[in-house]
């Protein structure tokens, strides 16, 4: 971890560090703060007092391991114990016990929590920081209206505004406003104190009318006036102490609580010296805010930029968990209070153990992790996805914005994001700009602000000092951006460098620079930092790339990228996908599922992950990397995980690519591939699907798991064992029974078949009254059974049913319809798989693996893929791997092109292949048509880029419908694969059919296959008897629906069918 004042070269911080620090802060500080707030509870007669002794709380080590929690669908949590005392005031006796108040879910080494067997992660939220903010708006006359908005700690807003006559009003709700003099008087000041504490007393006196003097003549009158406006009550309220307490509680304490951060911001903005423990709005704050508002009216002071990061705060894991803990303690307080009163009423002797229950705390955290918008299921598609998910920042959530109401200005990039929030990595769609990602070196400061590190440049000292600066501090410094010293301190700096000062980007002399960047990747997130040559790409395509890398499927045979950025190893290390040695030792035993490490006189067993399913059905598997007998150092890699090779992230494959059109099969971003990628398992991936069934205890008896299922073919039951569960290693097809289950049911006498009634009457044989409710393999689920789990919950009641889970492994080769993508936003769908002999081939005889469309490069402006493509070819011929930092043009102009050309030239020399680098068209080569053997007319760019296979696979998306459910209102087929829905024929599809004149097909689409109820019923019968399908004689249901909707608007629409019989054409001869 980097701290202030570190000397020398920095290291990249742990990518999960933000989550770890937040949870540790909650355990160390948040728990204690909330426990100290727990009040002393007395009964109604004030004879018994209950209190908690915070100093002695303890968290117990979990009884189960992480793996067992996932396996048994339990929560990986720690039990919280606190000392509590019960004091009898009459006798001064005290009974003290250590009580269990609930379970707190713990964070594991990945920065996630396991709740009910599911990995969940808490997202950091960006909120407007509490304090006061001044802005200016134009009214309908074009005159500036100045407003000061006071934001409380929980997000409530109150406004101060100044009108054209320099009168100041306080707006406590959208509709009601009162004079600031009334508000100040209600808060306890008289007129003399108000005028003594403001800078412009004459302005306050100028709008003081006789009516106003009467309102503020006494504190009681001011409170009544304010209460009438604030509570919006009619009539004349009467002053009382209860009214005063209610106003104090509802407004001055709840609505205007600034909190620790708000008090600090208010003091800084208004130059106040109020102590930090005064977290509520005071009369001094109101008067100082009014003074500043008057100054703005007369051209003094500055307005606030609400989108600047200095005016934002991060609501981290610690804050969210602490809020939930406080909520649970409030519920616990109500429970204890009610239990004490009940015990006294029934003349029972309470004990601390009897008064406290663990339900409030446990249920509060379970509902938080299960229902809160900022608690999400961890995306585990690949190792990169796990890290990036924990570093997200969201403007959404409770107290934040919504995708529908957020403006463009909020979504846009701000200069204060520099080095703190990645300008590239955000979601696409309605949440663009609202969900961001932390920059690599950013950290959350003590006051909830995002801090970024810089090197301080000082003429006095030769050493280098690192500073972490908040957004409000670094705007006062000249910050040099992207200079060469970020990597090599020995290079002599240029005379003029680009710099940032007060949210402006300037070009200044090196002597004027105060701070400089510490790393070229400092401004980007992890996803964007893994894109080589990102400086040559359009930002929109880089955004797509950083999102698509998270969708890459781990392949069965992973491969390191030839061209990378150098962060691949750190990303793999922090993802938790690797097995790392925790200490030195010697490997004494290895197996597919564990490693035994001997050292310090004992043996450490390190379990490996074997064919574990992620929540995106991808396969997580660790492969051994150390032989038996090898000596291991601490931190050494013992096993590679999914999508890692040699400890580096490996999401895709280096394949030979040509950029050229090919018979139209790669138009509109389609991709043509060679069958070699299929037969040699280049892009083969494993996927694990989970199928589960539960056995309940019904009112007719318990459900039974068995292999004796009547009325089912023996072929469907062939894979079941004697218990009725599918056997491990079985190959199952669609429709096979995975778990045989019978459910008892009550059958009426009249519903028996005749032969069943005869058997009962003559022989007295009891006919089975069970129905089969087996778990069957759905369509597209064929594969190999790799695991079966029978989870039996304690108790075995109907509320805790037994669960049987079957895991099936599928091997998926790449096929037509799958989605592939590069690292530069170049994505496409496989359109055709060609035989190797038909693919274009190079001058050395090698056939190309993929053919991309060259028209996808110029308009998208992602030229980085061309640099990567050519450099990858050179690296494959020279057997080299390149790790290139972004913005290499800071060393010299055209640095990227010079590097690529020099490597291609060297590859051409070493391999004696002049076609690798031809001076007439460098980077291109003449290639041949595999079908004819003739060369193509133009030279073509060929290379070896890194191509990913994405999770969007055709096996999960392909769907067909013959018949199914219809919507109740429109009578049209439902939408979506999950609902067995139909294919929508929209407006543009109808135009296309009209353009080709296919009238009968169009009529079928709009009637029989859609919402013509009578016609679609007749289709089946006429098809069976072989007759012609009759034409529909009335309007479809959607048209009738339109007519009914028009009738609701008092518009009558009559319609009739025009046929050949009653349709006459009167035509006159010319």
Swiss-Prot record:
Subcellular location, record wording: Plastid, Chloroplast
UniProt-listed InterPro entries: DNA-dir_RNA_pol_bsu_ext_1_sf, DNA-dir_RNA_pol_su2, DNA-dir_RNAP_su2_dom, DNA-dir_RNAP_su2_hyb_sf, RNA_pol_bsu_bac, RNA_pol_bsu_CS, RNA_pol_Rpb2_2, RNA_pol_Rpb2_2_sf
Entries under CDD domains matching the protein: RNA_pol_B_RPB2
Alphabetical keyword list: Chloroplast, DNA-directed RNA polymerase, Nucleotidyltransferase, Plastid, Transcription, Transferase
Family label: Belongs to the RNA polymerase beta chain family.
NCBIfam families with a match to the protein in the record: PRK00405.1 (NF001616)
Known function: DNA-dependent RNA polymerase catalyzes the transcription of DNA into RNA using the four ribonucleoside triphosphates as substrates.
PANTHER family per UniProt: DNA-DIRECTED RNA POLYMERASE I SUBUNIT 2
The protein, known as: DNA-directed RNA polymerase subunit beta
Organism per entry: Nicotiana tabacum (Common tobacco)
Source taxonomy: Eukaryota, Viridiplantae, Streptophyta, Embryophyta, Tracheophyta
Gene designation per UniProt: rpoB
